[in-house]
Amino acid sequence: MNKAFTREVDRDDEDDEADLESPVLPSGAKNYITAGGYRRLRDELKALLDDERPKIVETVSWAAKNGDRSENGDYLYGKKRLREIDRRIRFLTKRLDLAEVVDSTVHHGNDQVFFGATVRFASDQGEERTIRILGVDEAESARGEVSWVAPIARALLKARVGDEVKLVTPRGVETIEVLEVRYPPPGGEADVVRA
C-alpha cells in the first residue's frame, strides 16, 4: 500500500480528555497563585524539560531504530508519553505566564479573609471545618485547600471573624460563621509550602 494512505498513530482520543481535567479559570479572571504554588509549578516544568522529556525522546529514538513501529510497544508508549509531557509543558508554560503571585503574608494578623487565608468556620449545624484558599492550579481538596473561585471561598472572601455569610449549596442556603482567620507570618510562607 502506498505510504500516503497509511498513517502512524500519533494521537489518542484519551489525550484530548486530559485537557478537560485541568483546573478551569473563569473567563477574564486572574490566575492568582501563592509563591509556593508558583515554585511548585515552575519546578515541575523544569523537571519535565530537563529530565523526563529528554529521557523519553531518547527511548523513542532508540525504539524507532528497531524496525516496525506499528507493533513496537516501546515506540508507541514513548510517543504517547511524549505527547502527554508536551501537553503538560504547554499547560504549565501558559499558567506560569498568566500567574499573578500573591503574597498572603502581608495579611498576617488580619481577621479578614483574603486569598491565601486559612479559615476555620462553623456551619449552622455546628460542624467546624478549616480550609485554605489558594489558586486554581495549587488547591487540593483532600488537603483542605480550595480554589479561590470555589463557592465556599467566594462566600468567605472579605468576611471577618464573627461574620456570618450565606453559602448556596445543592441542599439549599447554609449560614456559616467565620471563627478564625490565619495567614503565614512574613517570611514564613515557605513553612506552609508542600514539598
Where are these regions (language model features)?
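Structured, basic alpha/beta domains of bacterial-type, RNA-associated proteins
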Residues: 86-107, 175
